[in-house]
Curated annotation (Swiss-Prot):
It is an enzyme of class 2 (transferase). Keywords: ATP-binding, Kinase, Nucleotide-binding, Phosphoprotein, Transferase, Tyrosine-protein kinase, Virulence. The keyword NAD does not apply. This is Tyrosine-protein kinase PtkA. Pfam families: HAD_2. It catalyses: L-tyrosyl-[protein] + ATP = O-phospho-L-tyrosyl-[protein] + ADP + H(+). The gene is ptkA. Required for growth within macrophages. Catalyzes the phosphorylation of PtpA on the tyrosine residues at positions 128 and 129, thereby increasing PtpA phosphatase activity and promoting pathogenicity. Also phosphorylates the thioredoxin reductase TrxB. Disruption phenotype: Deletion mutant shows impaired intracellular survival within the human THP-1 macrophage infection model, and fails to inhibit phagosome acidification. However, the mutant displays enhanced resistance against oxidative stress in vitro. Disruption of the gene increases secretion of the thioredoxin reductase TrxB. It comes from the Bacteria. Belongs to the HAD-like hydrolase superfamily. CbbY/CbbZ/Gph/YieH family. Interacts with PtpA. The presence of a phosphate donor increases the interaction affinity. Interacts with TrxB. Interacts with several eukaryotic-like Ser/Thr protein kinases (eSTPKs) in vivo, including PknA. Activity is increased by phosphorylation. The lineage of its organism: Bacteria, Bacillati, Actinomycetota, Actinomycetes, Mycobacteriales.
Amino acid sequence: MSSPRERRPASQAPRLSRRPPAHQTSRSSPDTTAPTGSGLSNRFVNDNGIVTDTTASGTNCPPPPRAAARRASSPGESPQLVIFDLDGTLTDSARGIVSSFRHALNHIGAPVPEGDLATHIVGPPMHETLRAMGLGESAEEAIVAYRADYSARGWAMNSLFDGIGPLLADLRTAGVRLAVATSKAEPTARRILRHFGIEQHFEVIAGASTDGSRGSKVDVLAHALAQLRPLPERLVMVGDRSHDVDGAAAHGIDTVVVGWGYGRADFIDKTSTTVVTHAATIDELREALGV
């Protein structure tokens, strides 16, 4: 491996792009404790390429496509299909992702941004994050370095959140169909689920394509839904970030947002075109899913 380049001066540090807060209704109250002192840019780009500034009121999140069929959970009824996000929802993957992110920036001689990196980089496609940091021609080299390091060691710096294994088993016993939709590369997602012994619970595992043609949550969910047809009347997305909510809303699907992930700051004073339920604990998630 080539040695790291000479480090940039601090005045030229790259700036992370932040995703917009997701829209929520108040079926239950979320934890609105936002991380402070990040020193990161307030200007960000969401999964659909919409640029928003957090210093302004409101957001520019696009509405769901007109053709999107309304397929959501019904009040008082358990879902028939649950689609899970991976990072921050099923597994605590922040340590490995942050470690490989640091490695990628060190490799090209770029300083690592200050602040809570997990809050800003875990969830969306890493190639989008790196390309939005103002790294210029070095962005592609950083992406290659990140992928190599994450494939070699970062993926294993990971753990299953407490209670996830039994929850999945109970959902399957109850006859609920299960799937995964993640912006992580699909082969890596399968590797992680297999490593934790939970791959067999999922009818479909949909992730980002390795050629970069499919990466946004909207596209990954479309890929998953196409494989899950015919779709039942009651289905729900379970995730931890705003792009999970926005991606599901684009397909007319409600979301349960878990409180143990990395997106607490995404859900402050916003509304949604679909229902957003907040589950702070695994027991609350069980209640929301009817098991």
